[in-house]
Curated annotation (Swiss-Prot):
Family to which this protein belongs: Belongs to the universal ribosomal protein uL16 family.
Keywords annotated in UniProt: Chloroplast, Plastid, Ribonucleoprotein, Ribosomal protein
Organism: Populus alba
GO cellular component: chloroplast; mitochondrial large ribosomal subunit
Annotated signal sequence range: none
Protein name: Large ribosomal subunit protein uL16c
NCBIfam families reported for this sequence: rplP_bact
Localization annotation: Plastid, Chloroplast
Assembly: Part of the 50S ribosomal subunit.
Xref: InterPro entries: Ribosomal_uL16, Ribosomal_uL16_bact-type, Ribosomal_uL16_CS, Ribosomal_uL16_dom, Ribosomal_uL16_sf
GO BP field: mitochondrial translation
Length: 135
């Protein structure tokens, strides 16, 4: 699963997901892409599940690019813990995704294969997405 090698600070604020994605909203590497239509946190497990599903579906040939990276730590407190005594410890990593952001890209395969593989990956995502073709 994806996670940063090291970060400057161990814990982060939750933040807000306002507006649309200004970066990573165009197809850069492949010919087909999966684009987010809603804002969300996508965990490293979800990213990996989608990537594996796509890889398994295209088998040999074809290349997949993951355009998002989970660089935000999410902290959780132990269950049945009283209030206070600081922020919880980092448990998992998420990528902050805004509408318009490309999540995966794919190239080197036929359109019908790409559409099938990307739709399987889309079902692993917690948000509505759309399939995009570079014309």
């Amino acid at each position: 699963m994806l996670s940063p090698k090291r970060t400057r600070f161990r814990k982060q604020h939750r933040g807000r997901m306002k507006g649309i994605s200004s970066r990573g909203n165009r197809i850069c590497f492949g010919r087909y892409a999966l684009q987010a239509l809603e804002p969300a946190w996508i965990t490293s497990r979800q990213i990996e599940a989608g990537r594996r599903a796509m890889t398994r579906n295209v088998r040999r040939g074809g290349k997949i690019w993951v355009r998002i990276f989970p660089d935000k730590p999410v902290t959780l407190r132990p269950s049945e813990t009283r209030m206070g005594s600081g922020k919880g410890s980092p448990e998992y990593w998420v990528a902050v995704v805004k509408p318009g952001r490309m999540i995966y890209e794919m190239g080197g395969v036929a359109e019908n294969i790409a559409k099938k593989a990307i739709s399987i990956a889309a079902s692993k995502m917690p948000i509505r997405t759309q399939f995009i073709i570079l014309r």
